[in-house]
Amino acid sequence: MILKKTSLPKVVKNILLDKKEPISLVHFVTNRCNARCSFCFIDFDDPKTFSHELTLDEIDVLTKNLGNSLLNVNLTGGEPFARKDLVDIAKKYLVNTTIQSIYVTTNASLPDRIKNFAEEVTAFDNQVELTFQISIDDMPDNHNRVRKVKNLFDKCIETYRLLKRMGDNINPVVSI
């Protein structure tokens, strides 16, 4: 990775000596999700589950206090694309930190939102690397059954293909 917003000596010093600033961050942006996976740890029956999401203003404050060594953020959840302000969240990280890559863990059920996110974020910063982690659990029927979403397997494939055509700095990956 070529460092664009910070220097290699600074990052190495932070990792090996100072250990003051994160270089990678997992940001759980929401508990909301349109799937109801049988293995999920989110308690969808608890009314408190969907409260306490950070607001965009709170994320602005957070990102301004992460230091100058952050290279990557993983936006995850629930389903991150359940948040309609996910592009704005990504922009906060791009403006306020030194990130060079954004990793999004998704069930790939919302291909239009995912495509829009990729287009808007790369238009905002054409140097950022975007990786979309798409999980496939089984063959189509079992995948859909376990996640309790009709045709989700097909949407995963559709989303993967859509992202694959979008550009060199957009990387769809599938975990099986």
Residue ranges and their predicted role:
Residues 104-105, 160-176:
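Conserved strand-turn element in the central/C-terminal portion of the radical SAM core barrel
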Residues 74, 105, 131-137, 173-176:
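Extended hydrophobic secondary-structure segments that form protein cores and membrane-embedded regions
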Residues 54-57, 133-145, 167-172:
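Short flexible/disordered coil segments
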Residues 68-72, 115-120, 141-151, 170-176:
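Noncatalytic linker/hinge segments flanking ATPase motor cores
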Residues 89, 155-158, 171:
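Residues within well-formed alpha-helices
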Residues 80, 108-112, 133-149:
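Conserved radical SAM core fold
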Residues 147-165:
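Glycine-rich S-adenosyl-L-methionine
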